[in-house]
């Protein structure tokens, strides 16, 4: 992937290293079940890697469930004895999380052909647009790649910490292996994030090419419009491939944060264990940050697509002697006006800042409802 190799600067090197790490980790865990055909320069699906990933994560899920049940039999949290409602909510959250991770891992296998099409389209674009676009370093691309990986590393550390803290007779190596399902969950989310940020980078390069070019031929405008159309179709394919997984993931983030805050209130206020605020704050911050990054990257790509219309307007407002050039510009502007980068879940809910704020407010209101409902037990 020469186009995405570091060109200059520490952030470029770091972003490239993180993308490589995600790729090799996904291969190692069977979550990216493809091999590279060097002759055709395309990815092809490997049934052995699919089978390996499915068996590995099935065993890890069974191990994690066994470890959780063993810990539950040995010790019951004091907070659960203090507040029975908290125990019920926590158990339902555990079941929901287990179900979500299982579905995401199964969907990763089921939709592997679609993922292959997306990856191959990105590889094809890489080879075809070198002479068409003005290649530059995209600051937001590097920034969001680094931020997402830092958030994922934080999630990994928290998962390992909680697995090691489980009170059962399992050796530490088995406790660490119990983290594989949550690691797989983060890598699957990382795939979606990477696909969206790569689409954003191409759209950003289209805008930069238009802004930097004082004299554009009709053939180049037509080629840019064709590229823009391919990026629109690619973004639709990415969302169609990941909409169910993204819905489940967003639900898990919000439920998890609500349960955790309620847990902190019971421990900190009812049981007067104020130190728990300091211990649990990093996890809460990382959860909200990770949730918000998935919202922002979709909103960023959508706004970048809207920016293309504004850049084209600068060209269409000018008078052109070349009728073919004017026709190409009008067709490109028409495409940008009637088809936009909108990342919608199941074709209904747009992923943007407004949706993110609404979900956070809904989660907060649900927490208030819990406190009012169970006020006498606090």
UniProtKB/Swiss-Prot annotation:
Q: What are the subcellular locations of this protein?
A: Cell membrane
Can you tell me where the transmembrane regions are? 14-34, 49-69, 89-109, 144-164, 179-199, 246-266, 355-375
Do you know which InterPro entries this protein is assigned to?
7TM_chemorcpt
- On the tree of life, the source organism's domain of life is Eukaryota
What ranges are annotated Extracellular (topological domains)? 35-48, 110-143, 200-245, 376-378
**Role played:** Probable gustatory receptor which mediates acceptance or avoidance behavior, depending on its substrates.
Single GO molecular function: ligand-gated monoatomic ion channel activity
The name this protein goes by in its record:
Putative gustatory receptor 22f
Q: How does it sit in the membrane?
A: Multi-pass membrane protein
Q: Which family does it belong to?
A: Belongs to the insect chemoreceptor superfamily. Gustatory receptor (GR) family. Gr22e subfamily.
Q: Which Pfam families match?
A: 7tm_7 (PF08395)
Q: At which residues is glycosylation annotated?
A: 207
Q: Name one GO cellular component term.
A: neuronal cell body
Q: What gene is behind this protein?
A: Gr22f
**Keyword Glycoprotein among UniProt keywords:** yes
- Tissue localization of expression: Taste bristles in the foreleg and labial palps.
């Amino acid at each position: 992937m020469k186009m995405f190799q570091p060109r200059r600067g520490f952030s470029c090197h770091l972003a490239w290293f993180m993308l490589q790490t995600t790729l090799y980790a996904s291969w190692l865990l069977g979550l990216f079940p493809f091999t590279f055909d060097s002759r055709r320069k395309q990815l092809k699906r490997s049934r052995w890697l699919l089978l390996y990933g499915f068996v590995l994560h099935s065993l890890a899920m069974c191990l994690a469930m066994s470890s959780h049940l063993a810990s539950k039999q040995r010790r019951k949290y004091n907070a659960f004895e203090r507040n029975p409602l908290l125990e019920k909510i926590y158990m339902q959250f555990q079941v929901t999380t287990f179900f979500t991770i299982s579905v995401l891992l199964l969907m990763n296998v089921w939709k592997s052909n679609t993922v292959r099409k997306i990856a191959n389209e990105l590889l094809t674009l890489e080879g075809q647009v070198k002479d068409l676009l003005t290649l530059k370093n995209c600051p937001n691309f590097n920034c969001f790649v680094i931020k997402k990986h830092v958030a994922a590393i934080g999630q990994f550390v928290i998962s390992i910490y909680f697995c090691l803290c489980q009170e059962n007779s399992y050796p530490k190596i088995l406790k660490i292996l119990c983290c594989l399902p949550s690691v797989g969950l983060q890598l699957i989310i990382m795939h979606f994030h990477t696909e969206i940020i790569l689409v954003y980078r191409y759209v950003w390069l289209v805008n930069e090419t238009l802004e930097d070019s004082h004299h554009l031929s009709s053939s180049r405008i037509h080629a840019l419009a064709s590229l823009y159309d391919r990026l629109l179709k690619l973004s639709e394919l990415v969302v169609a491939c990941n909409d169910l997984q993204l819905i489940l993931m967003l639900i898990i983030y919000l439920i998890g944060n609500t349960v955790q805050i309620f847990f902190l209130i019971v421990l900190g206020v009812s049981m007067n264990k104020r130190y728990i605020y300091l211990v649990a704050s990093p996890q809460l911050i990382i959860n909200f940050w990770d949730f918000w990054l998935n919202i922002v990257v979709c909103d960023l790509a959508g706004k970048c697509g809207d920016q293309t219309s504004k850049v084209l307007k600068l060209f269409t407002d000018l008078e052109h002697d070349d009728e073919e050039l004017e026709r190409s510009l009008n067709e490109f502007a028409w495409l940008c006006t009637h088809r936009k980068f909108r990342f919608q879940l199941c074709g209904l809910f747009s992923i943007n800042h407004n949706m993110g704020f609404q979900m956070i407010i809904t989660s907060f209101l649900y927490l208030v409802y819990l406190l009012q409902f169970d006020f006498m037990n606090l």
